[in-house]
Each structure stands twice: as C-alpha cells, then as structure tokens.
UniProtKB/Swiss-Prot annotation:
Cellular compartments annotated: Virion
Keywords: Capsid protein, Ribonucleoprotein, RNA-binding, T=3 icosahedral capsid protein, Viral nucleoprotein, Virion
The UniProt record lists the keyword Hydrolase: no
Protein name per the record: Capsid protein
Amino acid sequence: MSSAAQPMSRRARRRAARRALGSQPGTSGGMVIPVSFVVSGATSADFVTYHSLYSRLAAYNGDLWIRRVAVRVTGSVAKRMGKYAFFEGLAVDKSQILSAAHARPYVYGLPSTLSLPGGRRQVKDFQSINLFFLLDGTAHAGEFAAGTFYFEFEGSPNVDFPRDSEGSNQAVEKFYLEHINA
C-alpha cells in the first residue's frame, strides 16, 4: 500500500465513507466499504483511466450492488484532476467525459461523490465499467496518485473481502494509469 494512505480502524473508515457519501448509518439499508488504490507509471496523456476487476468480488456475493462511489485522491496527478465519470469499456474520448450527464468535477482534497450511470449496478458489472479522469495538462511517466474509493453497497452486510499481502482486512486493489488514444 502507498505511504500516502493513513491507517484507520474499520469503524473510522466506515464513518468517513458515510460522511463522504452524505448518508447516515441506518438510513439507507446499505453498507459502505473503502477500497484503496495506487496508480503510477503514466505515459503522457491528457486523461487517465482507473480500472480493476471488481467482478472478483461477485464470487463473495453475487447479489451485491453498488449505488454510489465517493473518491478521495492525493498525489501529483490528483492536483490536476478535473471531471470524472464511469463508462462501459475503454473506448472513451475527452468529449464523452465532458458531456456525460453523470460526470462530476473532482475537487482536490475533498471526497467527490458519483452515482453510477443507470442507477445501482451489480459488482460483477465492474469488469467492464471504468472510471475516467480528465486532467489539467498531461500526466507523465513517474507521476502518481493514491487514494480511496468509498463504495456504497446494497446486499449482504457480511461480505468477506480478500486480504492483501499484509493481512489487511480491507481489499487493496492495484490500479494503473494508462494512455488512452482519443
């Protein structure tokens, strides 16, 4: 895990996630679980994509649904992030991100909340749903971002997330910056 991520107790992480999502415990009937990510090694690009195989979580609960995602990012790339949006697949250009009805501006240092296109989505759908950020300027090789996605779930409250190599009780997914040809 990146040194940028500060260790928090599970209870503190969930409180922070609920605040980021604007929901209070017990009001939504769902649950909030944070997933950390680290991205690095970009080639020159004016927008980036973060993606990972969240479909593997479906093996723990095929009826698990995601309603909203809050994003908090730090690092050299994060300071220049603009609008962001989810899309099916990777064939996306800048104009699609700018014009997407569900796109939101990213405010550095603050959690930004984004509802999924079409409402709630099953976790297994995330094998083809990717998050795109526009950048002010370009990302270069060696730049990085680190942070957390806070996922608001519907489904079983007893999902057993896989442990990372350090034995953490939160799932740690590796993301990467990738040059996308518009």
